[in-house]
C-alpha cells in the first residue's frame, strides 16, 4: 500500500518514480522477448500465458497497435512474480553471453585466416606447432589457392573453405581458447568490448 504510515510518518512502498522505472524495465524486457525467434523463446522459462501474448505482439505490425500490444504484454508481465521475471532476465543474459562468445570465436578464426594469407609459411608453422593434428598439406594448398583467387579477382571459394577448415579445427581442438592468432600488442579482449 502506498502512502504515509500513520504511526511513523514514513512512506510505504516504492515511490511513483521507482514504479515507473520498474514498469519501463519490464516493457523493455517484453520488447526483447518479442524480438526473439520461436526457438530462442522456447529455451527461456517463460510461462505459457506470456508466450501467447508475445506471439500476439509479433503478429501485429502496425506501429501504434504494436506499441499498444507491447504495453499490454508488459501489463501481464507485471502480474508475474519477481522470481519468474528474474529467471527470464538471467536466461536472456546467458543467451547474449553465449552469442557474444560465438562471435568472438568466429573473429579469432577470421584473424587466423588473414594471418595465414598475409604471413604464409610463418603463420602456418605457428598454427601447426600449436595444433599438430591439422593437415599441413591441405592448409598450405588452401592458402595458396586463396591468394591466387584474390590476385585473379575470382570468387573466394578457397578463402571460404580455409575458414571452414579453421573453424572445424577450432571446434575439435579448442583453437579459440588457445593461441588466438593475434599479432604482438593486440588484445584478445577487443572482441569482448
Curated annotation (Swiss-Prot):
<feature type="region of interest" description="Disordered">
    <location>
        <begin position="1"/>
        <end position="20"/>
    </location>
</feature>
<keyword id="KW-0963">Cytoplasm</keyword>
<keyword id="KW-0699">rRNA-binding</keyword>
<dbReference type="GO" id="GO:0019843">
    <property type="term" value="F:rRNA binding"/>
</dbReference>
<dbReference type="GO" id="GO:1902626">
    <property type="term" value="P:assembly of large subunit precursor of preribosome"/>
</dbReference>
<dbReference type="GO" id="GO:0043022">
    <property type="term" value="F:ribosome binding"/>
</dbReference>
<dbReference type="GO" id="GO:0005829">
    <property type="term" value="C:cytosol"/>
</dbReference>
<keyword id="KW-0694">RNA-binding</keyword>
<dbReference type="InterPro" id="IPR023153">
    <property type="entry name" value="DarP_sf"/>
</dbReference>
<comment type="function">
    <text>Member of a network of 50S ribosomal subunit biogenesis factors which assembles along the 30S-50S interface, preventing incorrect 23S rRNA structures from forming. Promotes peptidyl transferase center (PTC) maturation.</text>
</comment>
<feature type="compositionally biased region" description="Acidic residues">
    <location>
        <begin position="181"/>
        <end position="193"/>
    </location>
</feature>
<dbReference type="InterPro" id="IPR006839">
    <property type="entry name" value="DarP"/>
</dbReference>
<feature type="region of interest" description="Disordered">
    <location>
        <begin position="171"/>
        <end position="193"/>
    </location>
</feature>
<comment type="similarity">
    <text>Belongs to the DarP family.</text>
</comment>
<feature type="compositionally biased region" description="Basic and acidic residues">
    <location>
        <begin position="1"/>
        <end position="10"/>
    </location>
</feature>
<protein>
    <recommendedName>
        <fullName>Dual-action ribosomal maturation protein DarP</fullName>
    </recommendedName>
</protein>
<dbReference type="Pfam" id="PF04751">
    <property type="entry name" value="DarP"/>
</dbReference>
<keyword id="KW-0690">Ribosome biogenesis</keyword>
